[in-house]
Amino acid sequence: MGVYTYENEFTSDIPAPKLFKAFVLDADNLIPKIAPQAIKCAEILEGDGGPGTIKKITFGEGSHYGYVKHKIHSIDKENHTYSYSLIEGDALSDNIEKIDYETKLVSAPHGGTIIKTTSKYHTKGDVEIKEEHVKAGKEKASHLFKLIEGYLKDHPSEYN
């Protein structure tokens, strides 16, 4: 088994606490509302929403995939960190066992947020991850993030 790690960093004008509430804590409600073509629904299969929880994410009509399951490892509301693994679903393909994700939102000096993400692809055997697969995932995540950011700018009184 190989492990391929990819890191990404980008910024937002939205303050970290507000962004964390929308992007992590309420994503299961917010994303289907603002991007139903991407995510149809999210449901908790096991747990209470905290560490150890298993969630099923059903993709919308505009997606190439049907569903994935996430296992939450940690949610730190004070330090704005979140980690989970994609453990099941057609987005994994035959060559990937799981994908670990870590997200950290850091308050930026200008009042916005620096978003740091790490993705670790755990492959089956000696399979290498194709760069275009990672790039496509980053582009979808970036688009979804921009939708959330736009929603927060259009609704400044929410998630305070």
Swiss-Prot record:
Annotated Gene3D superfamilies: 3.30.530.20
Gene Ontology MF annotations: abscisic acid binding; protein phosphatase inhibitor activity; signaling receptor activity
The keyword RNA-binding is assigned to this record: no
Matching SMART domains: Bet_v_1
Keyword hit for Repeat: no
Cited InterPro entries: Bet_v_I/MLP, Bet_v_I_allergen, Plant_def-hormone_signal, START-like_dom_sf
Any one GO cellular component localisation term in the record: cytoplasm
Keywords for this protein: Allergen, Pathogenesis-related protein, Plant defense
An annotated GO BP: abscisic acid-activated signaling pathway
Protein family according to the UniProt entry: Belongs to the BetVI family.
Oligomeric form and interacting partners: Monomer.
UniProt-recorded name of the protein: Major strawberry allergen Fra a 1-B
